[in-house]
């Protein structure tokens, strides 16, 4: 949050830099997410995931503090500060990738099938809660603003986050992972073999494409929704900022419904995760079509309700995607969970970063081509809707693994082609 929001604002407002500078730095942080499969493989081969999680958090904390220092240096020497910032944002990406991939693999290893929707909901809720608390606390302590205060507050938040991570993980991981096959090491050859195995699994491959396409669609409106509301509906900066809160409220509602509903109905309807994911994608497409239709500029359009609906659909889709990720990650066996989770984390990071860039670039390109501003924004929303529709079509074709209960084989009533691979306990 500090790296992608607070430092972004300081570079643009306080230092007067072009938005391209922080945009490129944040893009570098997303770009290195392609290394996530390697971090996941390391935690698989190492026998324990906790060291990778804490190591990633420590690297993230140091890099965020370094990034704040680099921004302060920019005020006196832009070239030196930019060089430091590039290194720090790359390290931020590595820290996020190592910690996030290993944490999700740990959660997937310990969570029973029936509890995965609720677990995915809790993970997202805790992430949003952490962002909210950090934003409120740092906003209070950063005023009156100075570069020295920025560095001090960032360092304090980083130190506190590291301490919380250490306490939260104490005693969670009992024992070690099952021993890898004889001769398996952390070598690059072993990593390549594991990655090839995951890619040759049709369900894992389809899910990778699904994550990439859906995250592009998910993030394309990230940088354009507030400008759209200001241009088409004449909203003030304060009003468009509250619109973001309305959307996040919808996300929370969708996650709660998806998490609780998915957990409650998982045993009776094994295909509930697939149905939630498809429903979330289609509802997201419908909400985006409505936003595109509202570009005519009718101030009577219920924009807040439309944005809440978009957030709700996104939340429903997100919970189903994370829970499905946990289930599919375990299908490769406990010594491949981290690598598979890393593969999908890489697809998520690259898709999210690319989507935000493409959304903003598409608006600029259409306006340069002579399209009115409202039509340009509507065009991007239509592209997003098409992306979510394609994601729904991909999700329908993904067969989720399931455990076979003692009473006999359980099949997915909604999908005769549901596979019979067993996820490990």
Regions found by a protein language model. Give the residues of each.
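Helix-loop boundary and gating motifs at the non-cytosolic
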Residues: 1-33, 205-210, 214-233, 240-243, ...
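C-terminal ends and interior cores of transmembrane alpha-helices
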Residues: 54-79, 279-298
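A membrane-interface helix-boundary motif in multi-pass transporters
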Residues: 49-51, 80-81, 139-159, 269-275, ...
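Juxtamembrane intracellular "pre-TM" segments in multi-pass secondary transporters
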Residues: 175-208, 232, 407-425
């Amino acid at each position: 949050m500090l790296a992608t929001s607070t430092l972004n604002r300081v570079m643009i407002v306080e230092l007067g830099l072009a938005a391209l500078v922080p945009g490129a730095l944040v893009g570098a942080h997303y770009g290195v997410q392609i290394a996530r499969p390697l971090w996941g493989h390391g935690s698989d081969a190492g026998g324990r995931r906790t060291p990778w999680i804490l190591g990633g958090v420590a690297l993230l904390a140091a890099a965020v503090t370094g990034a704040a220092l680099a921004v302060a240096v920019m005020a006196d020497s832009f070239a030196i500060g930019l060089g430091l910032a590039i290194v720090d944002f790359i390290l931020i990406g590595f820290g996020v990738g190592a910690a996030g991939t290993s944490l999700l693999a740990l959660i997937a290893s310990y969570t029973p099938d029936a509890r995965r929707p609720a677990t995915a909901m809790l993970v997202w809720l805790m992430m949003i809660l952490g962002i909210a608390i950090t934003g409120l606390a740092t906003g209070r302590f950063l005023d009156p603003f100075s570069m020295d205060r920025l560095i001090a507050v960032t360092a304090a938040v980083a130190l506190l986050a590291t301490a919380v991570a250490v306490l939260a993980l104490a005693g969670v991981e009992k024992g070690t992972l099952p021993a890898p096959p004889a001769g398996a090491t952390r070598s690059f050859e072993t990593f390549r073999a594991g990655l090839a195995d995951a890619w040759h699994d049709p369900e894992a491959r389809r899910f990778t494409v699904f994550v990439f396409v859906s995250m592009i669609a998910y993030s394309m409106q990230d940088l354009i929704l507030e400008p759209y509301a200001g241009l088409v509906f004449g909203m003030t900066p304060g009003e468009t900022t509250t619109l973001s809160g309305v959307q996040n409220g919808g996300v929370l509602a969708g996650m709660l419904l998806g998490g609780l509903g998915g957990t409650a109905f998982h045993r009776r309807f094994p295909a509930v995760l697939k149905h939630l994911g498809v429903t979330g994608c289609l509802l997201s497409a419908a909400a985006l079509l409505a936003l595109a239709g509202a570009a005519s500029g009718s101030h009577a359009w219920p924009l807040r309700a439309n944005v809440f609906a978009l957030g709700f659909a996104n939340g429903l889709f997100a919970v189903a995607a994370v829970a499905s990720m946990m289930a599919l990650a375990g299908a490769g066996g406990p010594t491949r969970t981290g690598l598979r989770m890393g593969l999908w984390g890489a697809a998520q990071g690259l898709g999210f970063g690319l989507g935000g860039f493409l959304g903003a670039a598409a608006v600029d390109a259409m306006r340069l081509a002579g399209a009115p501003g409202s039509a340009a924004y509507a065009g991007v929303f239509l592209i997003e809707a098409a992306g979510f529709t394609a994601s729904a079509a991909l999700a329908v074709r993904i067969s989720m693994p399931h455990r076979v209960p003692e009473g006999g084989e359980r099949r997915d009533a909604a999908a005769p082609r549901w596979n019979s691979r067993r996820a490990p306990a």
